[in-house]
Amino acid sequence: MLPPSGFAGLVPPSHFQARPLPTLPRMAPTWASDVPLVQSPASQDVLERRLDAQRSTVTTWGQDFCGDGQGLGRRGRSLELGFSSALSQQAELISRQLQELRRLEEEVRSLRETSLQQKMRLETQAVELDALAVAEKAGQAEAEGLRTALAGAEMVRKNLEEAKHKELEEIQSLHQEQLSSLTQAHQKALDSLASKAEGLEKSLNSLETKRAGEAKQLAMAQKEADMLRNQLSKTQEELEAQVTLVESLRKYVGEQVLPEFPSQEWELERKELLDTLKHLKEDRADLQATVELLQVRVQSLTHMLALQEEELTRKIQPLDPLEPEFPKKCRSLLRNWREKVFALMVQLKAQDLQHRDSTSQLRIQVAELQEQVTSQSQEQAILQRALQDKTAQVEVERMSTKSLQMELDQAQEARRRQEQQIASAEEQLKFVVGAMNSTQAKLQSTMTRMDQAVARIPSLSNRLSYAVRKVHTIKGLMARKVALAQLRVESSPPSEAAPPLDTDLSVELEQLREERNRLDAELQLSAHLIQQEVGRAREQGEVERRRLIEVAQQLEQELQRAQESLASVGQQLEAARRGQQESTEEAASLRQELTQQQEIYGQALQEKVAEVETRLREQLSDTKRRLNEARREQAKAVVSLRQIQHKATQEKERNQELRRLQDEARKEEGQRLTRRVQELERDKNLMLQRLLAVLPSGVNKKCSPRSVESSSSESPAAASCKESVKGSLTVLLDNLQGLSEAISRDEDICVEDNQNTKKTKNPPSDPLLS
């Protein structure tokens, strides 16, 4: 029987009830950044020492329990308390490790987010560096474009100067040729007026010279057309280049200049030149036809005159020796009349030809002067447009210099921003590298701790299994002790004061059994749960370890990439700095060149403007002088035309007077001849009457046959003489009538020709006369 004093230090059953384990909050700890993530090795050593001490106490408790039976309840309770405290500590350790694993997961997520942000920043920096490189390339391209534009402007200026010099030389040569041709034409006209007898030959020579001049003019026109075509092609190319340049630079100038179409003007000029060539060819063909007709008429007239002279010389013979002056007078009168008529006809034809030549020359001169005026006005307009283009180019260059200055300022500001961004990026990269190194060190430390915890899990499981076995042995010993106590109680004699004690003991024993069963069930359940939690924690730890290894590898790769990108960014930064220095140097040199070019170009432009103004003034004065000369020549031509018309009217009046005089002379000569014949017949009759009266009648009788014979002989002689005189007179009259008819026909033809020429010349001659 157990002594009652042995149960005096028993613990109530409520003390052995299951206590809930302390649960830590799942929220993120506030001491994550201040307290170290994992417990220090000193705390781990303390925990291990506590576990060893508990293990030693458990073993000593078992030994004492085996050796001593009185302190069984106390030792069992202390053992259970120690075991429950060890389990609670292990559960706390496991929960702390789980919390640390969760905190590590959160840190890994935050590191991933920071790495993604750093990647984005690096990508933005790379994009900005690419944009800077593109901007630098664009600046270099613009600088090269400005250089090429300056070179092109210089080439255009040189080409324009050469073309203007060539045009001036060509215009001077053309003016000299025109002046020489005009002087030659005037000299020829004066020579033709001075020498009327050689008018036809000189007109033919003048026509030949005109033909040669027209051929020369045609050749010159063809050359000019070729030159104009070449110039057209060159100017079209230059204009296309200028149009492209103007269109590309309109946004700087702000002016919307309508594109010019000089090709249409050149086409119109070419068409006008072709029309003038056609008209000249037609005029030349007409002149050739008129010359041929005139030659035919002259030949026919000379032939007719030769025939008439032969007939007159053959028919008119001196029959009357008493009157030898009559045929001479007739011949002289006829010759003078022929010469005068021929001279008048030649003069009229020469005047008509001169009038035609002068009018055609005046028309040609007026057309040439008009063409010169139009060409000079076109040149003036072209030069004004060129000046406007040059001023626009100067303004564009000024705007481009301003834009380049602004771009340089922007590039410098961008460079400063890039330097600041690069410095901030370097600092961020340094911070990221430090954070990565710290996270890598923390990950390595956590991995080592996880490995240590995983390595300690088998030893802890062995300890748990050993503790379970010890509990079973203790339970068996306890049951044996209880059974021995019951046997002792049963074998001991009952006493009077013992029943209440037995009832208390039995109640306490029942409670102890229940408590034992409950604790046994709890121990088994807790051991099973601990094993499950340990397995789950082991699996989670393995998975987390693998994931952390992968994350660490990824972070290492990202770190390497970041370092490589940092190196490339540094290289690009160095290249960008070098390119920026080169661009700044090139910009400075370009500024100097641009200022020099602007000064040179401004001086050259001012000189060119002054030269163009002086040349235009000279050309305007020359054109005014030529216009005045042309007007004076036109007035002279009008005066000469009026004089020629007056002379023609006077010549017509003279011709009419001569015809009237010739008719009167012819009538008087016929009357005189008839009177002479009548007087001769009367004298003859008187002589015959006197002879008949003087001679005696005998003699008359004797001599009657003789007289009859003589009269018969004289009568045929007189008759023959009369017949010859009458025949000569009739022939002369017939010749005179034929000549007068021929002259009248020629005059009618000349009058018709004059009327036709006047009709054809009156419409264009009105502006000249006005």
UniProtKB/Swiss-Prot annotation:
It is found in: Cytoplasm; Nucleus. Residues 56-289, 334-420, 476-669 form a coiled coil. Keywords: Coiled coil, Cytoplasm, Developmental protein, Differentiation, Nucleus. GO terms for biological process: cell differentiation; protein export from nucleus. Residues 573-592, 641-672, 700-721, 744-770 are annotated as: Disordered. Residues 648-672 have a biased composition (Basic and acidic residues). PANTHER family: COILED-COIL ALPHA-HELICAL ROD PROTEIN 1. May be a regulator of keratinocyte proliferation or differentiation. This is Coiled-coil alpha-helical rod protein 1. The lineage of its organism: Eukaryota, Metazoa, Chordata, Craniata, Vertebrata.
